[in-house]
Every structure is written in C-alpha cells, then in structure tokens.
C-alpha cells in the first residue's frame, strides 16, 4: 500500500529496487563521493550496493525494508532506503535519501520526503527517524531544512572505516 500511496502523491514513478537494479543505483551513488567519504575509505562498488539492498537493522525482517527508486521520465532521480516498524512499532527508519547529482537543489528529495511523510502518516506511523554522520554538513543542513529534530550525538562503529564515527540521531513526528 505504501508504494501505491507514494505513486499517487508524487509526479514520479516509484519502484521497489532489487539486485537487478544495481548498475542504475551504482551510477547514481558513485557521483556522491563526498557522502561516501563519511562512511568508507574507497569509492562505492557494486558489492557495496548489493549489500545495502540486503542489509537489515537488528530484529528487522526483509519485508520491512523498502529500497525505493523514484523516476522522473524514466530517469532515477531519488533513492530512499526505508525500514518500517524500526526501531519500534509505528516508527519508520530512513537509512538513506540520495538525489541524482545533476538534480540537486531542484527539490526532488524534498518532494519525495514530503510525500513519504504523508504516506507513512496515512499508514498509521507516528515518527520518521534517521541518523547521519556529524561530519556530513550537507546532510545536517538538508535534515534541518526538512524539519528533523536533532537528537543525541553518539559514536557508532563503522566496519568499513575500522573506527567509530559520530552520528546525529534525528526524528520528525508525522
């Protein structure tokens, strides 16, 4: 039902992405080296994308995860990684929102997040949560502009970097 709501609310086509879409996802993500430098020491690879498509938070089930692509005229313009009922019931976790580099500052991600919040609210969700690297000033500014309230800053071990990174937990009521 979530996909149908998003399809209705947006001027974009919404698709649940799978490993068959790895090349398209990689093409979009590879243009965002400044984002990936906060989380890994090397450029993003197909293997990274395939792992991201399957990675679940603790206690989450595969059917809770939605790795979504939003298309404008057959072009992938926004990626969203969403986990429903995580970290608790009636809460959704936003793992990633990323816009095609050539479409930045054209409000694609803002439109997607606005529709996502509306769709989640209609589905009975109460809160949308996320986190981002404290060092990622672009993500911090974007989340501030979207109305996400800043929560606590905590250290999280990042296995790709081999050390802890400081992340900011954030949430927004739906």
Each PLM stretch: what is its role?
Residues 79, 133-134:
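Short amphipathic helical patch at the helix-1/turn junction of helix-turn-helix
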Residues 110:
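Residues forming the Rossmann-fold NAD(P)(H) cofactor-binding site
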Residues 121-132:
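Conserved GNAT acetyl-CoA-binding A-motif
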Residues 131-132, 144, 149-166:
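Conserved catalytic-core motifs of GNAT/GCN5-like acyltransferases
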Residues 113, 137-138, 158-161:
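Short glycine/proline-centered loop/turn elements that form peptide/ligand docking sites
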Residues 2-12, 16-22, 27-102, 113-115, ...:
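Acetyl-CoA-dependent GNAT
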Residues 107, 124, 147:
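Short glycine-rich hinge loops at helix-strand junctions in the catalytic core
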Residues 100-102, 106, 135:
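Active-site acidic-Proline motif in GNAT/NAT acetyltransferases
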């Amino acid at each position: 039902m979530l996909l149908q709501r998003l399809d209705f609310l947006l001027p974009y086509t919404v698709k649940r992405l799978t490993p068959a879409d790895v090349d398209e996802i990689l093409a979009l993500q590879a243009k965002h080296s400044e984002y990936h430098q906060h989380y890994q020491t090397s450029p993003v690879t197909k293997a990274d994308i395939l792992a991201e498509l399957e990675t679940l938070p603790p206690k989450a089930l595969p059917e809770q995860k939605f790795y979504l692509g939003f298309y404008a005229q057959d072009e992938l313009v926004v990626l969203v990684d969403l986990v429903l009922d995580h970290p608790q019931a009636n809460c959704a976790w936003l793992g990633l929102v990323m816009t095609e580099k050539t479409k930045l500052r054209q409000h694609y991600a803002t439109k997607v997040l606005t529709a996502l919040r509306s769709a989640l609210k209609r589905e009975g969700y109460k809160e949308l949560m996320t986190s981002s690297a404290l060092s990622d000033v672009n993500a911090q500014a974007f989340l501030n502009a979207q109305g996400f309230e800043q929560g606590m800053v905590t250290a999280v071990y990042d296995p790709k970097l081999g050390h802890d990174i400081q992340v900011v937990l954030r949430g927004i009521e739906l």
